Amino acid sequence: MVESEKIKKAYPDYKKTVCVDFDGTICKWAFPEEGALQEGVKTALQFFKAMGFKLIISSCRTNKKLNPKVYKQQVRIIRDYLDKHEILFDEIDDGEQGKVVADYYIDDRAIRFTEKKGWLGVISEFVNEIQKDE
């Protein structure tokens, strides 16, 4: 049984989900401002919706540990940005539920783990990424 089938069995109302990061993924990195829309993002998210996926937008902006006074305002800021650019989405993670349950995560800062690559492969990719940042 694949992971999404296990999730569906445990949570009957679950819909296959893509969780997409906001800063650096949907828009160019400009925090605390909102950057320009990334090229192709609108088409990509329309594609995921057409495939039947639920779209959840996630952002560290909504993490109340980073700034407890403004994290809820960030949900509104993200929603306004998405509406302004006519970006399709189902919900914005408000940071209250913990990690978003999703089948796929799209993020500009992710390093993907696979059993084939293993942890040595993750370390190698990590080292390459931090060397690019220096």
Give short role names for the model-derived ranges.
Residues 1-134:
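HAD-like aspartate-dependent phosphatase fold
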